């Protein structure tokens, strides 16, 4: 029964639904704003999922650059890591875990070669020295500092938690 006391039949209901669904096609607009990041004059388009994350200033260390996402994650740190062509990270292990998604380029270490789209999970049982012949951009998530295992870089270990 409708608001005027009239009986609504099944046919009336079907006609009503048909009337609602028989509209012109709607044109959907993409509202995704593309975001990019630049390291040493090389610009990378970020995946859409990262577009809304606030990115801090870039810190440059030789052929390495890092920009931290400002996510207030306590002990978890999320970064973009750029390795320039011919660059690498000194030999190290991890005090906690490190998750890496390779966003662009490639790198290799003692475990193998990694290319765009690869997902790598490492912890304190892994020692490696990532190097990139042609450069790469990585999305990394870690819960503690690196622990350098060779050379002068070992001098950074006592202050590692302040710089990771």
Model region roles, listed by residue range:
Residues 1-54:
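Positively biased amphipathic helices and basic secretion/translocation or surface-docking motifs
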Residues 52-53, 58-59, 147-164:
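Alpha-helical membrane-targeting segments
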Residues 54-87:
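A short glycine-rich, His/Asp/Glu-containing loop-to-beta-strand
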Residues 70, 80-81, 90-94, 111, ...:
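Short histidine-centered beta-strand/loop micro-motifs
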Residues 84-87, 94-109:
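Glycine- and acidic-residue-biased ligand/ion/polar-headgroup-sensing regions
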Residues 104-105, 119, 123-125, 141-144:
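Short, loop-centered acidic/histidine patches that primarily coordinate divalent metals
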Residues 109-132:
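Short acidic-glycine-tyrosine-enriched beta hairpin
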Residues 126-148:
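Ligand-binding loop in jelly-roll beta-barrel domains
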């Amino acid at each position: 029964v409708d608001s005027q006391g009239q009986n609504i039949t099944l046919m009336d209901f079907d006609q009503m639904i048909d009337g609602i669904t028989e509209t012109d096609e709607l044109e959907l607009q993409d509202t995704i704003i593309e975001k990019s990041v630049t390291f040493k004059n090389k610009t990378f388009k970020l995946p859409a999922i990262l577009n809304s994350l606030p990115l801090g200033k870039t810190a440059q260390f030789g052929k390495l650059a890092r920009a931290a996402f400002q996510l207030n994650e306590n002990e978890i740190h999320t970064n973009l890591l750029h390795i320039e062509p011919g660059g690498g990270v000194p030999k190290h292990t991890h005090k906690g875990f490190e998750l890496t998604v390779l966003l662009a380029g490639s790198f290799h270490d003692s475990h193998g070669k990694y290319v765009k789209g690869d997902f790598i999970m490492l912890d304190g049982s892994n020692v490696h020295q990532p190097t990139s012949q042609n450069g790469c951009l990585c999305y990394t998530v870690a819960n503690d500092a690196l622990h350098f295992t060779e050379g002068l870089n070992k001098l950074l270990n006592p202050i590692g938690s302040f710089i990771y």
